[in-house]
Amino acid sequence: MAKSKFERTKPHVNIGTIGHVDHGKTSLTAAITKYFGEFKAYDQIDAAPEERARGITISTAHVEYETDQRHYAHVDCPGHADYVKNMITGAAQMDGAILVVSAADGPMPQTREHILLARQVGVPAIVVFLNKVDQVDDAELLELVELEVRELLSKYDFPGDDIPIVKGSALAALEDSDKSIGEDAVRLLMSEVDRYIPTPERPVDQSFLMPIEDVFSISGRGTVVTGRVERGVVKVGEEIEIVGIRPTSKTTVTGVEMFRKLLDQGQAGDNIGALLRGIDREGIERGQVLAKPGSVTPHTKFKAEAYILTKDEGGRHTPFFTNYRPQFYFRTTDVTGIVTLPEGTEMVMPGDNVAMDVSLIVPIAMEEKLRFAIREGGRTVGAGIVSKIIE
């Protein structure tokens, strides 16, 4: 059978289900595919394949579906640890999330943890599905649970009062038992997701940034840096900044090459070589970035949310303490940094996720939501995301 062409007519949005174990995330995912995509049964989604991201193995199920307005790629994880890893590594980028809460239980510990993680890793918007409403006969009790969920969201700086909450039953939708809380609820949920979760800005429309992977000197032409354009567009003749590791400097791009062909521009996703005016081979290195002037700044101190690998995942065998000094791998290079743990946290065990402060020995072009790996001598021992820049 011929592979069907991916039609890029609708805006594309990445989304995922989050929430406490057994509250119905996977059943809801199955129910959405039933009405908006190729139906995937619970067992097909639950048997999530393993994948590797930043040296960490994560089980994630990917499904796709579409509404009249948009095309969605949806991730669902079988285990709680997979969620933590997924959100911190950005293995599955989320432009928005559907928080599933069982009406019978109300918010539970992982409900809280997933909301906090969504806040820390910068998930822009959440829509709530209050599941299993058929198990609650008391309307006042339902209202109480809804109130609790709104308060919890507000506590973590989401607009709890405005977030859409749809009540229903994923099981009813899968079994066609009660249309009002089944199919109707799932359709209402997706119209709220269409309305409330913003369409992300396409990478090509953002400010130009390219991490430098390699530097060459071409006799008679000057210095060429290669890398994959992360976002935006760079045109021949444009002025750009070289940011990170050393003091920021400006130069002009005098040529762009791709597959040995000359282009007039390079854009997000392209692997290019950029010829730079008046830059010495020694004056630029891997780990710096080329960027639109003023769009990104170098920093050494930041707050991070990190996941530390277990021994079985190839991580450390022992805990670490404040003043731990691993390498932080940003984009294309390792930089040594010193870790300060939050007050009340004596040590971090393998398998923990932790908030920590980091101070790098040289500055890196950095912004909030930037991901990194934590390494010891080239071996990945953790993954993290910049939650706040300090200086």
Swiss-Prot record:
Subcellular location: Cytoplasm
Record family assignment: Belongs to the TRAFAC class translation factor GTPase superfamily. Classic translation factor GTPase family. EF-Tu/EF-1A subfamily.
Record-annotated membrane-spanning stretches: none
Xref: Pfam families: GTP_EFTU (PF00009), GTP_EFTU_D2 (PF03144), GTP_EFTU_D3 (PF03143)
Region (G3): 76-79
GO MF term set: GTP binding; GTPase activity; guanosine tetraphosphate binding; translation elongation factor activity
Summary of subunit composition and partner proteins: Monomer.
EC numbers for this chain: 3.6.5.3
Purpose of the protein: GTP hydrolase that promotes the GTP-dependent binding of aminoacyl-tRNA to the A-site of ribosomes during protein biosynthesis.
Name of the gene this protein is made from: tuf2
Enzyme class (EC, first level): hydrolase
Annotated stretches, region: G2: 55-59
All copies of domain tr-type G, residue ranges: 10-201
Keyword Metal-binding applies: yes
Region (G5): 169-171
Start and end residues of each stretch annotated as G1: 19-26
Protein name in the entry: Elongation factor Tu 2
UniProt KW Ligase keyword: no
InterPro entries on file: EF-Tu_GTP-bd, EF-Tu_GTPase, EFTu-like_2, EFTU_2, G_TR_CS, P-loop_NTPase, Small_GTP-bd, T_Tr_GTP-bd_dom
PROSITE patterns per the UniProt record, alphabetical: G_TR_1 (PS00301), G_TR_2 (PS51722)
UniProt binding sites for Mg(2+): T26
CC annotations in GO: cytosol
Annotated catalysed reactions: GTP + H2O = GDP + phosphate + H(+)
Organism domain of life: Bacteria
Keywords from the named record: Cytoplasm, Elongation factor, GTP-binding, Hydrolase, Magnesium, Metal-binding, Nucleotide-binding, Protein biosynthesis
